[in-house]
């Protein structure tokens, strides 16, 4: 099936522009819909808070409002010890300018992995260093360095409060090159030492256990996203046990395992991380937030989807821990059932994935990387149960990712990303659209060529599905998940989704 000439419609912003009065009204109501959307600095105390802070409400003329925690810190405010701004959820990019910045933020996460510089990051997007910094400051209100420093400090603050990691381990996990630099910047920015903060929190140092929380906005359909991953996991590298998700992880040279479970009382996911992954905790957290779509805002999504979302208002769009991992899984699932594709995916891990030790017998291998699959002859790939054409497609995708002909990190256009992927022989619009929807994390993505979506909408043409979905902008990806979910409830999923 060919493309249907989808045009890029103007995206609506994630929120209408708010003035100080509206910010203050949201603060007064402690409205959770705005948690992470803005922060309030209290001029009399020089402390900044989340809008849901349980502390006594400050007078309006004492308040200053910021879009980002980093902007509040640059203005001289330090984080509240009660509402803990480091636990606030983030926001998904919607409009075109935000998509460029969103891609840049994904690359900032990668910089933590690969030690890239800001000029190198700017060059990736074909911008001058000066223009790139100016664009980020315009959108975010802070420089890239200021943003990264705040992210590191807030993670350190969370680890000091919630874990029993040593100071050296916390400095490493937060992205600092030395304990001295960590102590110096923390004390400079927050006006107390890391040791003093830990003492005040009543959390002593004793061991390398690392368990922390990642917040979300309610409602959150944990059962739905867990069911989705349970049916599509890489056996040997992932598993779902009851209400928990487990997987092996490799980021750079760091390898280990994680477990994730829902903590509904705290509106967060509880994550346990192997000690060997502490050095890459910042990029790991970013990947987990994308994987579980933790930055979604259910209320505006539900309002836009109307009756479509009534039965499942907290449904999330499953993301990607790794772009190639999702791409490979999509290729393995072409023209066969989900169950059959899951069997083949397990064989791929068993045959080509590197072994790893873990405390869980179900976790014994890594999912192969693009470079590892690219090095495997097509004849070898066929031995896991692939046809020659499918094996060639998988090899072609692996080469394209390895050679950076397909780059999921700096993608700023849904249409361009789909076009790049369809240049690989064997990857058509449906496969490319599905990969882009999960990997790029764009709320308005809609793979209209999908037969399941067409069936749920009672149409026979992709163009008709696209036209009907127009009313759900800018949340069409969530509409797609709701439509697939409706078919699953009716036991009418097409073969490639069942």
Regions found by a protein language model. Name each.
Residues 3, 7, 12-498:
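HhH-family (HhH-GPD) DNA N-glycosylase catalytic core used in base-excision repair
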């Amino acid at each position: 099936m060919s493309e249907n000439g989808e045009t890029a419609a103007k995206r609506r912003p994630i929120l209408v522009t708010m003035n100080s009065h509206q910010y203050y009204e949201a603060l007064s109501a402690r409205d959770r819909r705005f948690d992470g959307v803005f922060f309030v600095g209290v001029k009399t105390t020089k402390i900044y808070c989340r809008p849901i802070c349980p502390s006594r409400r400050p007078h309006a003329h004492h308040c200053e409002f910021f879009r980002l925690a980093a902007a509040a810190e640059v203005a001289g405010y330090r984080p509240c010890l009660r509402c803990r701004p480091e636990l606030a959820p983030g926001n998904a990019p919607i409009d075109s300018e935000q998509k460029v910045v969103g891609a840049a933020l994904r690359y900032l996460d990668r910089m933590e992995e690969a030690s890239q510089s800001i000029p190198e990051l700017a060059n990736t997007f074909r911008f001058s260093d000066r223009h790139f910094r100016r664009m980020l400051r315009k959108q975010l209100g802070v420089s890239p360095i200021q943003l990264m420093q705040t992210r590191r400090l807030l993670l350190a603050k969370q680890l000091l409060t919630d874990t029993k990691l040593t100071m050296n381990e916390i400095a490493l996990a937060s992205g600092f090159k030395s304990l001295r630099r960590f102590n110096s910047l923390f004390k400079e920015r927050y006006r107390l030492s890391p040791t003093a903060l830990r003492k005040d929190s009543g959390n002593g140092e004793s061991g390398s256990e690392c368990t922390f929380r990642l917040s979300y906005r309610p409602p959150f359909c944990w059962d739905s996203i867990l069911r989705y991953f349970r049916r599509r996991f890489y056996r040997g590298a992932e598993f779902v046990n009851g209400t928990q998700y487990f997987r092996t992880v490799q980021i750079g040279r760091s390898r280990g395992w994680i477990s994730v479970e829902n903590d509904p009382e705290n509106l967060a996911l509880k994550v346990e991380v192997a000690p060997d992954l502490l050095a890459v905790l910042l990029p790991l957290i970013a990947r987990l937030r994308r994987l579980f779509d933790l930055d979604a805002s259910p209320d505006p999504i539900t309002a836009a989807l109307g009756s479509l979302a009534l039965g499942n208002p907290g449904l999330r769009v499953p993301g990607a821990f790794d772009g190639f991992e999702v791409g490979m899984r999509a290729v393995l699932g072409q023209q066969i059932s989900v169950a059959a594709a899951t069997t083949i995916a397990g064989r791929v891990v068993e045959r080509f994935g590197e072994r790893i030790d873990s405390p869980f017998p179900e976790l014994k291998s890594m999912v192969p990387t693009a470079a590892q699959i690219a090095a495997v002859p097509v004849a070898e790939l066929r031995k896991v149960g692939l046809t020659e054409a499918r094996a060639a497609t998988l090899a072609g995708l692996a080469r394209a990712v390895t050679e950076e002909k397909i780059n999921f990190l700096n993608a700023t256009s849904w249409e361009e990303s789909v076009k790049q992927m369809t240049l690989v022989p064997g990857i058509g619009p449906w496969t490319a659209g599905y990969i882009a929807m999960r990997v790029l994390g764009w709320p308005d993505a809609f793979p209209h060529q999908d037969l399941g979506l067409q069936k749920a909408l009672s149409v026979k043409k992709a163009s008709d599905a696209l036209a009907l979905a127009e009313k759900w902008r800018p949340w069409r990806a969530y509409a797609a998940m709701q439509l697939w979910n409706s078919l699953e409830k009716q036991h009418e999923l097409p073969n490639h989704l069942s």
